[in-house]
């Protein structure tokens, strides 16, 4: 019989190994937490990662059978960047179908009225901050979780491409700044850098980047850059601004010792994909976000 219980310290070794096994093939899950860090995250003792915007509230459930931990899930409530209020299953990892179903039932039983998301299309809501570099979509490399969600009535509503660039094979090329455009660079309080394109005193484009050193003490995390956002306002697109900003961001990352850069982009973001591919990025994984109701 499977019982749903709060996480306890004795669950941590089993759940940590279960998590590592589940995400082992997911490229953007490469920088996984060690057992001590994972335990602090599951038990709510971990210091927040400034790079990520944590949920407002969260509950973690463990599926236990015969004293053994068979999986865990998290239910979170958060306000998204657009002001929308959401509730979502932000983690779901399990050893067998029965444990997965019990965990989904526990999350649904604790959720409020309205639509429930699973692995939502946002950053920073998983209790395991390192999961997918903070992106909460469910990696295609974890198909048994997708299968459990769909069998429980969830449907995918967004797909994301996970991309990676080898900066040694494709070093960035400096590009001239278009006439009439000024570039500014400024760090924010989350450890990221914003490069902005200014025209006539107005911001018309920006690119946000950092290394992944905040997410992991692994030396390779400090050598891996991440693009958190790239945008150009309507009316200034197709003028090469995005390419100029990306080239500048990649130059800065190389200057910080990076030899790789990662990003995610919505699968139907057709205008941006030629830019990323031309710079040398390749698709290494995909992820999906789900909803029910």
Where is each model-derived feature located?
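A short beta-loop-alpha structural element at the N-terminal edge
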Residues: 3-17, 23-28, 183-191
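Conserved donor-binding loop and adjoining core beta-sheet/short helix segment
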Residues: 22-23, 27, 31-111, 120-124, ...
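Residue-level recognition of the GNAT/N-acetyltransferase active site
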Residues: 90-95, 228, 233, 237, ...
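Conserved acetyl-CoA-binding loop-helix of GNAT-fold acetyltransferases
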Residues: 96-111, 232, 238-255, 273-278
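Conserved GNAT acetyl-CoA-binding A-motif
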Residues: 111-137, 253-264
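Conserved active-site alpha-helix within GNAT-family acetyltransferase domains
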Residues: 124-156, 243, 267-285
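C-terminal "cap" of GNAT-fold acetyltransferases
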Residues: 142-145, 152-155, 161-177, 259, ...
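Flexible, substrate/cofactor-facing loop regions flanked by secondary structure
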Residues: 156-238
């Amino acid at each position: 019989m499977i019982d749903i219980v709060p996480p306890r310290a004795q669950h941590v070794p089993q759940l940590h190994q279960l998590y590592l096994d589940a995400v082992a093939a997911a490229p953007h899950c490469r920088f996984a937490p060690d057992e001590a860090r994972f335990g602090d995250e599951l038990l709510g003792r971990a210091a927040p990662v400034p790079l990520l915007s944590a949920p407002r509230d969260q509950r973690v459930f463990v599926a236990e059978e015969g004293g053994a931990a068979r999986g865990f899930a998290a239910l979170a409530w958060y306000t998204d960047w657009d002001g929308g209020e959401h509730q979502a299953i932000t983690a779901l990892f399990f050893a067998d179908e029965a444990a997965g179903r019990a965990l989904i039932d526990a999350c649904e039983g604790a959720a409020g009225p309205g639509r429930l998301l699973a692995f939502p299309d946002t950053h920073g809501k998983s209790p395991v901050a390192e999961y997918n570099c903070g992106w909460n979509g469910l990696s295609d490399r974890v198909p048994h979780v997708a299968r459990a969600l769909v069998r429980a009535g969830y449907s995918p509503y967004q797909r994301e491409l996970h991309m990676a660039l080898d900066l040694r094979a494709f070093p960035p090329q400096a590009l001239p700044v278009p006439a009439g455009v000024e570039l500014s660079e400024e760090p924010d309080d989350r450890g990221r850098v914003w490069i902005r394109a200014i025209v006539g005193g107005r911001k018309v484009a920006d690119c946000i980047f950092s290394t992944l050193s905040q997410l992991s003490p692994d030396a390779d995390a400090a050598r891996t850059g991440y693009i958190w956002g790239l945008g150009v306002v309507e009316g200034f697109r197709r003028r090469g601004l995005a390419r100029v900003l990306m080239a500048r961001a990649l130059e800065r990352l190389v200057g910080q010792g990076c030899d790789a850069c990662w990003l995610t982009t919505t699968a139907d973001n057709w205008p941006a994909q030629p830019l990323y591919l031309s710079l040398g990025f390749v698709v290494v994984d995909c992820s999906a976000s789900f909803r029910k109701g």
